[in-house]
């Protein structure tokens, strides 16, 4: 026979004595279970020590998520707080964060979407749709991507022929766009808009269309 395990309630956990000496533990807040010798607690950070894939499934968490691998193709990660990814975001993945998003490597794929209420920091972006309530800061380059930021969009000069450049795609930076090179002979048109949000631009296009119509009719 085993011996009783002595465990106490840690942070955000309430313990209640039940019948036959059984103790029940209840979480007092949303979060992830953290178990250490002799204690059980609930914390507001979910740590994934691997890639997000079939072993983990999609993630939806009320708090912060730290992923020590990459987010696999087609999987979804949602958090009310920040999301930190040590690796990359593969094609077709979706990420939604109520805070900031930091991606150690890059984002790739036309069906890939990243949305953050705060800022987004990423090594590079190729063909993905990234939208931020703050800045979008890219360490190397952006190619054929959609970038919408209420803050600044910045691409740093690093190493490699693509470094510091925005080539192709649609880029909106409400507070400005900072880069070394815009456009490329190898890509389609590069659309850059600074100082205006997309909805404002649509209204301006409609207004211009009305003015032109009035001039000719």
Please state what every model-predicted region is.
Residues 157-159:
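Short beta-alpha junctions and helix-cap segments that line functional grooves
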Residues 1-150, 155, 165-170, 174, ...:
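Charge-rich, low-hydrophobicity low-complexity segments
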């Amino acid at each position: 026979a085993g011996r009783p395990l002595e465990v106490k309630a840690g942070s955000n956990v309430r313990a209640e004595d039940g019948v036959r000496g059984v103790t029940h533990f209840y979480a007092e807040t949303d979060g992830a279970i953290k178990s250490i010798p002799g204690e059980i607690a609930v914390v507001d950070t979910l740590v994934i020590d691997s890639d997000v894939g079939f072993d983990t499934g999609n993630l939806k968490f009320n708090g912060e998520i730290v992923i020590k691998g990459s987010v696999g193709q087609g999987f979804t990660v949602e958090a009310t707080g920040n999301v930190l990814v040590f690796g990359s975001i593969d094609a077709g993945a979706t990420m939604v964060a109520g805070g900031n998003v930091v991606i150690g490597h890059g984002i790739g794929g036309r069906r890939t979407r990243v949305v953050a209420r705060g800022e987004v920091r990423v090594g590079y972006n190729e063909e993905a749709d990234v939208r931020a309530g703050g800045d979008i800061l890219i360490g190397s380059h952006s190619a054929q991507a959609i970038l919408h930021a209420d803050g600044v969009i910045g691409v740093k000069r690093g190493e490699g022929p693509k470094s510091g450049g925005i080539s192709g795609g649609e880029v909106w930076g409400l507070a400005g766009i900072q880069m070394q090179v815009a456009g490329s002979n190898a890509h389609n048109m590069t659309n850059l808009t600074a100082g205006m949000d997309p909805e404002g631009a649509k209204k301006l296009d409609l207004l211009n269309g009305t003015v032109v119509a009035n001039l000719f009719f």
